[in-house]
C-alpha cells in the first residue's frame, strides 16, 4: 500500500506516530510561510502542515485537488486551534516528505466549499460526476447504498435465499412501459429487449424449484421522462414458493428493519396496513404520507340536497387547515392558482371565524342547515379553514390528497427524522385502460380493462371464480409498502395456474394467439407443476435516497441520467456510424413475397 493510515481515522492516540497518507488537496492556507492543507481521502480529512523549508517551498505550488502522498509525524494541534467539527480535529501531521502523485487542472467548481454546492448546476455536476463524487455528501451516498445492499443480503442469506442473475438481453414482452430495444446482429431484423423487470424469469425460477430467489436487479423502461425518474434503475427483487401474502410481508419487514438500522432508526413491526379503498377515501392517494394527521372527510351525502350547484356533483370532499382562517386574501387566491396548476377549476373554501361564524364564497351559497352543520361534520374548529373539492371522485380525491400535503408543509407538520410506514393492500385487480393511459402508463391488452399491477398478479382467493365476470369489482392479491408518501416496494401472489392466467389475458383483450406469441414460454412452464408463489420488489434507488435524506434519486446513483434522459458525462445517447448501422442490421428490411407479404 502507498499509505499506512487513512486521513480521517487519525486520532490523539496516534500522536508521535510516523504516518504516510495519500489523498487530494482540499482547503489550502498559507500563514507566514507555514502551509496548512486539508488532505482528503475516502475516510475524511486530516490537516497536514508544511513547516520544514524544503517541503514548505514545494508545497507553495500545490493547488486544489492535486493528488498527494505525504509522510510525517502526528502531533497535537496547538491549544485553541483544534477543530471540533472534524473527527481528526485534535491532531495534525507535520510533513517531512511530499510526493505529488498527480496534478489537477482548473476546477469547474469547488469541491470542498459547502457555500458553492447549491450554485453548481446539475448538468455541470453530472458532466464532472467524478469530481462531484469527491464531495463528502455525494461519496457518502454511494457508501450508504453499499451498506444497505449488504444489510439486505444478510437478511436474505439468513432465510436461505439464493442470489441469481437473470438475463439482461431478452425478448420484448408487454409489461406496462416501452422497451429499450437492441438489434440482434446475427439475426437481422430481430431485436432483443432490455428487461423492465425480472418478473417472468423469477417466476420461471419458481417453476424450476429454486423456491427462494433474490437479485439486486437492473431494470430498463423507455418511458416519457417524469420528475425524478431514470430510464435505468435498480430494484431488490425477491420471489418465494409455497407462500401466502403474510409470508412475503413478514420477510419484507425484516429487510426494511435491517436497512433502516443503517441510519440508526428502529422500525416498529408489524407495520400498519390499510386497504386501497381507505387510502383513497381518507388520503386521496394510494401512497399516503402518514407523518401528519390530516384526513379527507367525504361530504357527498351531507350536501345531497344542496342548492349550491358546485356541490351538485358525483363527489364532494373536504380537508381542514388548522388555523387557516387568518390567511390573507392573496394566500387564498394563491390556493386557487395552485389547484388550477393541477387541472382543477379551483379550491372552494369556508373560513371558520373565532366566534364560529362562517365566511367565504361557499358559506354564502349553502343553506342555513348546511352552514350550521358543516364545521362539525368535517371536524373544523374556530380559526380553521375548510377546503373543498367537488366533481368526479378520483380527481377530486387526488386534489384533496395533494392539498393535505401542501397544508402539512405550510404548517410545518413534517419534522425532520420522522418516518411513517404503511402497507396498502386489496387494490383493484383491473383498472379502465383509459385511466392507465391518462396517467402515462402503457395499457396492456386491447380491451377496456388493463392490469393495475401486472398481468401475472393473482386475484384474491374470493375473486378467483368470478373476476372475469365483474373485472371492476375484483381485488388483487397484492401489497405495496409506503414510506413518507413514497411507494418503496410492491408485490403480489402470482398466478400459477394456466387457466387463470388465460382468463386474465382474456379480460385484458390479449388473444390466445398473442398470449402464446408473447408469453408462450411462461404458459408452457405452468403446465409442469408450477408451485404457488409470490414476491416483492423494492425500489432501491428511492429507498437509499430516503435513507440519505436526498431530494432526488440521482444523488444515490453513481452515474445517473439528467432529467431529459441524457448522460452529460458521456453525452449518451449518441449517434452511431454508418458501418455500425449496417453491421447491426438496424436498417434491415425483410424481403416481400409474391403477394407483397413479408417472407419469414
From Swiss-Prot:
One Gene Ontology cellular component: cytoplasm
Site (Important for tRNA non-discrimination): 31, 80
Residues the entry annotates as binding L-aspartate: 175, 221, 453, 494
Primary enzyme class: ligase
Any Pfam family the entry gives: tRNA-synt_2
InterPro entries in UniProt: Aa-tRNA-synt_II, aa-tRNA-synth_II, aa-tRNA-synth_II/BPL/LPL, Asp-tRNA-ligase_1, Asp-tRNA-ligase_1_N, Asp/Asn-tRNA-synth_IIb, AspRS_core, GAD-like_sf
Keywords: Aminoacyl-tRNA synthetase, ATP-binding, Cytoplasm, Ligase, Nucleotide-binding, Protein biosynthesis
Catalytic activity, reaction form: tRNA(Asx) + L-aspartate + ATP = L-aspartyl-tRNA(Asx) + AMP + diphosphate
GO terms assigned for molecular function: aspartate-tRNA ligase activity; aspartate-tRNA(Asn) ligase activity; ATP binding; nucleic acid binding
UniProt-listed Gene3D superfamilies: Bira Bifunctional Protein, Domain 2, GAD-like domain, Nucleic acid-binding proteins
UniProt-listed GO biological process terms: aspartyl-tRNA aminoacylation
Positions of region (Aspartate): 199-202
PANTHER family to which the protein is assigned, alphabetical: ASPARTATE--TRNA LIGASE, MITOCHONDRIAL, ASPARTYL/LYSYL-TRNA SYNTHETASE
Family classification: Belongs to the class-II aminoacyl-tRNA synthetase family. Type 1 subfamily.
Its biological purpose: Aspartyl-tRNA synthetase with relaxed tRNA specificity since it is able to aspartylate not only its cognate tRNA(Asp) but also tRNA(Asn). Reaction proceeds in two steps: L-aspartate is first activated by ATP to form Asp-AMP and then transferred to the acceptor end of tRNA(Asp/Asn).
Quaternary state and interactors: Homodimer.
Identification of the protein by name: Aspartate--tRNA(Asp/Asn) ligase
Species assigned in the record: Corynebacterium jeikeium (strain K411)
Lineage, top ranks: Bacteria, Bacillati, Actinomycetota, Actinomycetes, Mycobacteriales
